[in-house]
């Protein structure tokens, strides 16, 4: 009957999502720490360049992340898994918020590689490209209020090379990873925010309520 066919189709889709999520998680779980240079390119819906920047990413599982834009302006996003700091150098402003590990709203947290969380938040498909040398995973958010319509992660020999996402307005952002170093020890101090000493009138906005 129609209803049973619908259930079977749903089950097949769920199994495909979980299978792709497990395959993606298996790759990500090989990496406990990650350091990389990231070239960021954002295009509008017509393919025109909106912004180009260079950032430095440092991550340590489960939820420690340092994302520092170094060009053409300076900005730092840092989390220790409890709080998240955002420092805008030009504005001389620091905002502090409670950390949220919702991977449907923060794509970089996909790199934490928890299969169940990925499958809960995204429909997932996988595809081999360039004669099998590139493995790409395409993720479509399940939540209607997701900030992104579509995301993809590409790997070569298990190393992350590219991450792309598209928002509801058709704006596309591509992150290209280079100088990737995985599973090397990271100084714990990297994930401790230090108030800049060279700023005279630093504005601090603390939204944590801690």
Spans of model-derived segments:
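Boundary at the C-terminal end of the N-terminal hydrophobic targeting segment
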Residues: 7-11
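N-terminal mature ectodomain segment of secretory-pathway/periplasmic proteins
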Residues: 23, 28-81
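Short, solvent-exposed helix-to-loop capping segments enriched in aromatics
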Residues: 28, 105-119
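Hydrophobic lipid-interacting interfaces of membrane-associated proteins
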Residues: 41-43, 87, 170
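An acidic-aromatic
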Residues: 56-107, 173-174
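Gly/Pro-enriched, hydrophobic low-complexity segments
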Residues: 95, 115, 119-204
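Short, solvent-exposed mixed-charge patches
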Residues: 208-210
